[in-house]
């Protein structure tokens, strides 16, 4: 079961990734984790990546693809894997295909921008404990204060509305074209593509995914 998750930041991919990992016994492959692990292990690719990053440059698609190729051969990937946050662009998707990394399912989590802004900009955090609230969906007992300590809640920089909108713009420009790419791949019989309504309840989405993936 080799799965790619697509969708804007805040569309609920992370929550469902946890469900899919547990249900199918597959690891989530994150390019950031992969880079850190390769650098820590001192592999040939890790050393290449470290040199590039130390020079303050971006790691090339080719290097990332080679890391993915190496990662999917490990024992924990024998039943499949879950890719979230990669590929981000069509050249990356093409490179993956050329490298022979095939995918069984591409799942797009569809949530309107305004709903994502509401979800993310409404988050409030208690810095000391990491407890997370939401002004609409999970409000604290007293506005702006942590339930346990009574201390003030704050907004993470990532959750500021302007930041959220910037991240959405990048997603629409860079990553959304992959939706069309994978729809076409599905028409050619190379993968299966499904669009999920990400505005539904978490449990409902999990139930749909279980039916869809079997």
Swiss-Prot record:
Pathway: Purine metabolism; AMP biosynthesis via salvage pathway; AMP from ADP: step 1/1
Region (NMP), start-end ranges: 30-59
MF (Gene Ontology): adenylate kinase activity; ATP binding
Coarse class of the protein's main subcellular location: cytoplasm
Subunit structure: Monomer.
Record-level GO BP terms: AMP salvage
Keywords: ATP-binding, Cytoplasm, Kinase, Nucleotide biosynthesis, Nucleotide-binding, Transferase
HAMAP family: Adenylate_kinase_Adk (MF_00235)
PANTHER family (UniProt xref): NUCLEOTIDE KINASE
Binding site for AMP: 31, 36, 57-59, 85-88, 92, 156, 167
UniProt EC number: 2.7.4.3
Its biological purpose: Catalyzes the reversible transfer of the terminal phosphate group between ATP and AMP. Plays an important role in cellular energy homeostasis and in adenine nucleotide metabolism.
Protein name: Adenylate kinase
Residue ranges, annotated region (LID): 122-159
Reactions catalysed, as given in the entry: AMP + ATP = 2 ADP
Organism: Tolumonas auensis (strain DSM 9187 / NBRC 110442 / TA 4)
Family from the record: Belongs to the adenylate kinase family.
Residues that coordinate or bind ATP: 10-15, 123, 132-133, 200
Subcellular location: Cytoplasm
Domain notes: Consists of three domains, a large central CORE domain and two small peripheral domains, NMPbind and LID, which undergo movements during catalysis. The LID domain closes over the site of phosphoryl transfer upon ATP binding. Assembling and dissambling the active center during each catalytic cycle provides an effective means to prevent ATP hydrolysis.
Kinase among keywords: yes
Gene Ontology, cellular component aspect: cytoplasm
UniProt-listed CDD domains: ADK (cd01428)
